[in-house]
């Protein structure tokens, strides 16, 4: 490992600060084959100060050069960059031209050593944020926090099962054979997860001995949708606690004649995992900071998960959580510096990108419990809410469900979905739509600009035609040019 990256990786906080002195740092890759723990990495205060000053100067120099239209230099790649200390500043991105307006006369192929986003492995000062609601304040280490359960569900609507689709992929195969079709694929292959990590970020981590109720309240209080789970007995990360787990708890016990919901609240995360998984524990899906962003996209879509922990290969610490939104944001920012593929001018209808068959929807008059049933049975992340005429009037996502905990209303699941949307105290994504005649470039620009996870495809009368998700777009831009169909796998 080269000195710059090794120094950066060593700047992660020690787990002794989260769970006591017995939580020694260890190699996540060696945890199954070794009975002894590696020694914790130690860095002197003078080294930390020098690293902080160098990182600050480099970040602003790099930022200025990109804003002036110059891509980051070859010598600023992830393997040569000094460690970035936490500064309490938000991650900054260069000003870019939207993909829909980008000049097709390219800038040439991207340099392989672009240093696009600096990374900071430590927790930043209060109030800083880098990835909207997904980065949160760090909780005190007194009770240590608990983690996940299952392998987080995929961002897109239900898998297409019908043999007929309103919008077949008429010209997608031909587009992939045209020059420049693989430019985004190569761009993601040439950049590592370290490049997309935030300058300053915070992680909420739960110990598996934490009570379920406290864990879900912690998610709400910090505005995050998932948290890594640390098992102090195994001295390793064992999964992620997600909003999906909260939905499963409500769905399983709301109408149970034997168990009251308040009894489940007192269960520890460890107990809930044992009950639900019944001993079939799956390994935590993770990635290394040295792995390519192409591999990150494939791992997210292939495993139908929403969040991908980036683990330090030496200590096993969580450095960052990659998401579909983060990856598309990274690609969108620097995509305007690349030659423009011709398929960005094609319409959604022509390319057939999205889900158009067997759509999961919910009536606005249906109870919340019905929406939970659909979330569990169909494994979808959001439901278009329609009225009796079939017109889209809202969008009810899994993240809306967690606010039942914040409002102490999870014992009233007979409330209608429409009423639940009207009572939302936090303005979330809302309903953003697109139409079949819009180009793929326009759709990508809108998703990136509005920072949403999906667009609802409607006609002129607001009747539902389909859903275009982040997974659909990343599959089309990055994986399809490589001949990989992770969505259908």
UniProtKB/Swiss-Prot annotation:
Family annotation (InterPro entries): AMPK_gamma/SDS23_families, CBS_dom, CBS_dom_sf
GO biological processes: cellular response to glucose starvation; cellular response to nutrient levels; fatty acid biosynthetic process; intracellular signal transduction; negative regulation of glycogen biosynthetic process; positive regulation of gluconeogenesis; regulation of carbon utilization; regulation of cell cycle
Chain ranges of the CBS domain: 197-258, 280-340, 355-415, 427-486
Database matches in SUPFAM superfamilies: CBS-domain pair (SSF54631)
Residue span of region Disordered: 1-113
Entry GO terms, CC: cytoplasm; cytosol; extracellular space; nucleoplasm; nucleotide-activated protein kinase complex; nucleus
UniProt biased composition (Basic residues): 50-62
CDD domains on file: CBS_euAMPK_gamma-like_repeat1, CBS_euAMPK_gamma-like_repeat2
Domain text: The AMPK pseudosubstrate motif resembles the sequence around sites phosphorylated on target proteins of AMPK, except the presence of a non-phosphorylatable residue in place of Ser. In the absence of AMP this pseudosubstrate sequence may bind to the active site groove on the alpha subunit (PRKAA1 or PRKAA2), preventing phosphorylation by the upstream activating kinase STK11/LKB1.
Family as reported in the entry's similarity comment: Belongs to the 5'-AMP-activated protein kinase gamma subunit family.
Protein name per its UniProtKB record: 5'-AMP-activated protein kinase subunit gamma-3
Organism: Homo sapiens (Human)
């Amino acid at each position: 490992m080269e000195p710059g990256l090794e120094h950066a990786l060593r700047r992660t906080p020690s787990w002794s600060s989260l769970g006591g002195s017995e939580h020694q740092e260890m190699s996540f890759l060696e945890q199954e084959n070794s009975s002894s723990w590696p020694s914790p990495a130690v860095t002197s205060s003078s080294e930390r100060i020098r690293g902080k000053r160098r990182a600050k100067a480099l970040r602003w120099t790099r930022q200025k050069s990109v804003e002036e239209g110059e891509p980051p230099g070859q010598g600023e790649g992830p393997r040569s960059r000094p460690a970035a200390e936490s500064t309490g500043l938000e991650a900054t991105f260069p000003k870019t031209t939207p993909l829909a307006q980008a000049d097709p006369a390219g800038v040439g192929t991207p340099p392989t050593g672009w240093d696009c986003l600096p990374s900071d492995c430590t927790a930043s000062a209060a109030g800083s944020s880098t990835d909207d609601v997904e980065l949160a304040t760090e909780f005190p280490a007194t009770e240590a926090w608990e983690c996940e359960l299952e392998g987080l569900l995929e961002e897109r609507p239900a898998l297409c099962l019908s043999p007929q689709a309103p919008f077949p992929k008429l010209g997608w195969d031909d587009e992939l054979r045209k020059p420049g079709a693989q430019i985004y694929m190569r761009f993601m292959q040439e950049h590592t997860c370290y490049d997309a990590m935030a300058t300053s970020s915070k992680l909420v981590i739960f110990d598996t001995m934490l009570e379920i109720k406290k864990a879900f309240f912690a998610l709400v209080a910090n505005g995050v949708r998932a948290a890594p789970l640390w098992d102090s007995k195994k001295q390793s990360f064992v999964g992620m606690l997600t909003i999906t787990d909260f939905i499963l708890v409500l769905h399983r016990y709301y109408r149970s004649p034997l168990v009251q919901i308040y009894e489940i609240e007192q269960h520890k995360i460890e107990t809930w995992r044992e009950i639900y998984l019944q001993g079939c524990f799956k390994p935590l899906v993770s990635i290394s900071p040295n792995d390519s962003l192409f591999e990150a996209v494939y791992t997210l879509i292939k495993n139908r998960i929403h969040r991908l922990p980036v683990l330090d290969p030496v200590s096993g610490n969580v450095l960052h959580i990659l998401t579909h939104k983060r990856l598309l944001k990274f690609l969108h920012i620097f995509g305007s510096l690349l030659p423009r593929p011709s398929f960005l001018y094609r319409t959604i209808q022509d390319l057939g990108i999205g889900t158009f068959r067997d759509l999961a929807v919910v009536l606005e008059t249906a109870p919340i419990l019905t929406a939970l049933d659909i979330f569990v049975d169909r494994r979808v992340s959001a439901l278009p809410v329609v009225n009796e005429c079939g017109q889209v009037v809202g969008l009810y996502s899994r993240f809306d469900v967690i606010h039942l905990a914040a409002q102490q209303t999870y014992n009233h699941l007979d409330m209608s979905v429409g009423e639940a949307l009207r009572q939302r105290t936090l303005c979330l994504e809302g309903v953003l739509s697109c139409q079949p005649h819009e180009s793929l470039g326009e759709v990508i620009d809108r998703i990136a600009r509005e920072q949403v996870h999906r667009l609802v495809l409607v006609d002129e009368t607001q009747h539902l035609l389909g859903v275009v998700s982040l997974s659909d777009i990343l599959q089309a831009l990055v994986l399809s040019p490589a001949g990989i169909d992770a969505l259908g796998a």
